[in-house]
A protein has these predicted regions:
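Active-site loop/oxyanion-hole signature of alpha/beta-hydrolase fold enzymes
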Residues: 46-86, 254
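Conserved HGGG/HGGXW glycine-rich cap/lid loop of the alpha/beta-hydrolase fold
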Residues: 5-58
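Conserved alpha/beta-hydrolase catalytic His-Asp/Glu region
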Residues: 124-126, 139-189
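Catalytic active-site module of serine/aspartate enzymes centered on a nucleophile-bearing elbow/loop
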Residues: 232-272
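Gly/Ala-rich beta-loop-alpha elbow adjacent to hydrolase catalytic centers
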Residues: 89-93, 97
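Short beta-strand/loop motif that positions the catalytic acidic residue
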Residues: 203, 209-211
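Flexible "cap/lid" loop of the alpha/beta hydrolase fold
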Residues: 98, 102-103, 108-139
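Conserved alpha/beta-hydrolase "acid-adjacent" motif
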Residues: 216-222
């Protein structure tokens, strides 16, 4: 474990494993444990817990944004001595990785996008449930906000269509730092990676995009769209976490490991 100081925030960094270096970021509300559960053994993984996540502080700057989080991650890569690395992550982490690849092509040698939730625009419709939860916490607090949300049309719809998403949304009300973290939720749900379809089309690196069905926050269509937009992307559909969590993570790690192994001898992927 290491730390990085940014704008008054002490950010926690994990640097574990050996071999090909992959900067792999967690999703919104996640942290090191989530990244570790997703990533296969046999490679070097660097994960920065974004501001307000895990053991990382919130810092002084507002609003929270993908630009902020991506700049923090790049600073962590600098501190780790990585000139060139594979960038990846799940959900929010995928959007951070995509931004890094498009904005810093000289630094990113490969791309892994797991269950992406953003394409190119800010505040996509699939982020509406998270924005709704954030607003309820900020306006009503956790107890009353949870009660209101439980009776909402959004909760009813997700109960039938994407129960795993609903469980994650209720988890935001249970966080000990729920009130403070709600601002992170609100800001990130309203933001976007800040890149265009043209930026994605210009990428000239190996890329893996992974998606699954039964997920309203991370639509399979989002993964399809990104895979089609990136010239050298490989698309993989895995079993939904909502139906088989163990199988989901097993297939996820297998896909990532196969991608990294298949490109481990490619000169452009070897960190300099």
């Amino acid at each position: 474990m290491g730390t990085l100081l940014r704008d008054g925030a002490t950010l926690r960094i994990t640097d574990t494993g050996e071999g090909l270096a992959v900067v792999f970021q967690h999703g919104l509300g996640g942290g090191e444990a989530q990244a570790g559960q997703t990533f296969p053994a046999g490679f070097r993984r660097i994960t920065l817990e974004c501001r307000g996540h895990g053991d990382s502080g919130l810092g002084e700057r507002r609003p929270f944004s993908f630009e902020m989080f991506a700049d923090d991650v790049l600073a962590a890569a600098d501190q780790a001595g990585l000139d060139r690395f594979v960038a990846g992550g799940g959900s929010m982490g995928a959007a951070i990785a995509l931004r890094l690849a498009c904005r810093h092509p000289q630094r990113v040698a490969g791309l892994i996008l797991v269950r992406p939730a953003w394409i190119f625009t800010a505040a996509p419709g699939n982020m509406q449930p998270i924005a709704e939860v954030a607003e309820l916490i900020l306006e009503h607090g956790t107890d009353k906000g949870r009660t209101i949300f439980a009776r909402s049309e959004t909760a009813t719809r997700l109960y039938h269509q994407a129960p795993d998403n609903l469980s994650s949304l209720f988890g935001y009300f249970d966080r000990p730092d729920a009130k403070a973290f709600a601002q992170v939720l609100a800001n990130i749900a309203a933001d976007g990676p800040g890149i265009s379809e043209r930026d994605a089309a210009a990428l000239d690196i190996p890329a893996l995009v992974i998606g699954n069905e039964v997920d309203a926050v991370h639509p399979l269509s989002t993964a399809y769209t990104l895979a089609a937009a990136i010239p050298d992307a490989v698309f993989a559909e895995i079993r939904p976490k909502a139906r088989d969590s163990v199988g989901h993570f097993s297939e996820l790690r297998t896909q990532i490991a196969a991608f990294l192994q298949s490109h481990s001898k490619v000169r452009s992927l070897i960190p300099s």
